[in-house]
Swiss-Prot record:
Keyword tags: ATP-binding, Nucleotide-binding
PANTHER family: CONSERVED PROTEIN, DUF4143 DOMAIN-CONTAINING PROTEIN
Keyword Protein transport part of the UniProt annotation: no
Amino-acid positions noted as binding ATP in the UniProt annotation, renumbered to this chain: G78, P79, R80, Q81, A82, G83, K84, T85
The protein's name in its UniProt record: Uncharacterized protein Mb2031c
SUPFAM superfamilies assigned to the protein according to its UniProt record, in alphabetical order: P-loop containing nucleoside triphosphate hydrolases
Species annotation: Mycobacterium bovis (strain ATCC BAA-935 / AF2122/97)
One Pfam family cited in the UniProt record for this chain: AAA_14
Organism lineage string: Bacteria, Bacillati, Actinomycetota, Actinomycetes, Mycobacteriales
The UniProt record lists the keyword Protease: no
GO molecular function, one term: ATP binding
Length: 441
């Protein structure tokens, strides 16, 4: 164990398994040797036996562990119930006196004077719900700039532009940002990919006993998010208004954003409609995929493409509660596109992602630069992938090194020297950018 691991108690390999129930960390459980990477079990509860799933999030844990090696302060953000607290307890071992939860009144009192509370501590100091402590980051700057630094800091917070802004401003050069999304196919295994697509990646939704229970949990999540969480993040917009806006955006999933159309539907000004979109984007429940502009002498689209980041939430906003309803819904293809895109985003982070589209409707679902070369991805829910005229335009205009058509099949095969059809299962179980590039050759 090196000096930093000794200092902050990092576990070089996962030693225990998080028990995820309703998004809360209930403890850890050493599995028997025969237990696979994820397994269903039941544990006793005071009033009922609760089904749970043990999920080891190796990729997210490794990413957080690397960040804690590099930076004196790590800010772990993500949507509510994504598993931030669970992950932090799995990766780092903070002593009880070095663990704070700002939602806990006792800990909030301890942190009323952050300098007094933190200056005498050593090792890994974990602070949860940090968005509730506006004076924290200037104090952290003083603490990490001490000649001898006996501590490192893991800061957890729900998605908040103010939180990220304060951290970036006060701790420039001292903080690394890590975003935790929902569960990935690599977390749950390819055999559970369809369930992950239907239910989404929030652990309580994915691990629910049934689709009905999962849908009910997501309904409650949406209500709580709109009525409480947004207000806590500083968004002062009525819950009913934001529900209408979010539902409208669900119907635009996978399409270009039209501020005029959303404003007309909500009977508000375009600037107000844009404010609603930005609020949901800042809360990490909506993705705005920005356009890539190539110097090609053609008019190109400038509006972002809109995706509801968690497909489980998308499906509830659209009234979809099971696989049959999903298969019959006209947003089936767009839903699958968004699911694959979010899985790729988790793999490719922190590389910026773009889409590309001209006024003549030549388009590319995803554009990214890797190792200094441009790559494109087309996400097609078809059994017979082929090269379209639009793809040929993208290859020429964007000078792509490779274009991958991601489809729900079983076989990888080339369609030309620069275009390859790749099964989604192979793409989504890739563990690194290097593995992905090897797959595209």
């Amino acid at each position: 164990m090196d000096e930093i691991e000794s200092l902050i108690g990092l576990r070089p390999t996962p030693l225990t398994w998080p028990v995820v129930i309703a998004g809360d960390f209930l403890g850890v459980w050493d599995p028997p040797p025969s237990l696979p990477g994820a397994a269903n079990h039941e544990i006793s509860a005071p009033t009922a036996r609760i089904s749970c799933m043990l999920i080891e999030r190796r990729d997210a844990a490794a990413r957080l562990r690397r960040a804690l090696h590099r930076a004196p302060v790590v800010l772990l953000t993500g949507p509510r119930q994504a598993g931030k607290t669970t992950l932090s307890r799995l990766v780092g071992k903070s002593a009880p006196e070095c663990t704070f939860d700002a939602e806990n009144p006792v800990d909030a009192t301890r942190l009323a004077d952050p300098m007094l509370a933190l200056s005498g501590l050593s090792g890994l100091i974990t602070i949860d719900e940090a968005q509730r402590i506006p004076d924290l980051f200037p104090v952290l700057r003083v603490l990490v700039d001490r000649p001898v630094m006996p501590a490192r800091f893991l800061i957890l917070g729900s998605a908040s532009p103010d939180l990220v802004g304060l951290a970036s401003e006060s701790l420039a050069g001292r903080v690394e940002l890590v975003e935790l999304s929902g569960l990935t196919v690599r977390d749950v295994g390819s055999s559970a990919a369809d369930r992950l697509w239907l239910r989404g990646g929030l652990p309580p939704s994915f691990t629910a006993r049934s689709n009905e229970d999962s849908a009910a949990w997501r309904d409650g999540y949406i209500t709580t998010f709109l009525e409480r969480d947004l207000a806590q993040l500083g968004v002062r917009i009525p819950a009913a208004t934001m529900r209408r806006a979010w539902t409208m955006l669900a119907h635009y999933h996978g399409q270009l954003f039209s501020g005029a159309e959303l404003a007309r539907s909500l009977d508000v000004a375009q600037t107000t409609a844009r404010r609603y979109l930005d609020a949901l984007t800042d809360a990490l429940v909506v993705r705005q995929l920005t356009p890539w502009f190539a110097n090609i002498g053609k008019r190109q689209r400038r509006s972002p493409k809109i995706y509801i980041r968690d497909t489980g939430l998308l499906h509830r906003l659209l009234g979809i509660d099971d696989r049959l309803a999903l298969e019959r819904n006209p947003k089936l293809g767009a839903s699958w596109e968004g699911f694959v895109l979010e899985q790729l985003a988790a793999l490719l982070a922190p590389n910026p992602l773009y889409y590309w589209r001209t006024q003549q409707d030549a388009e590319l679902d995803l554009y990214v630069e890797l190792s200094g070369r441009p790559y494109g991805f087309e996400i097609k829910r078809t059994s017979t992938p082929s090269i379209s005229r639009s793809m040929r335009s993208a290859l020429v205009d964007l000078q792509l090194a490779r274009l991958a058509i991601v489809y729900p099949g079983e076989h990888r095969f080339p369609l030309s020297d620069t275009v390859v059809a790749v099964p989604a299962d192979q793409i989504l179980t890739t563990g690194s950018v290097d593995e992905l590039l090897a797959l595209l050759k």
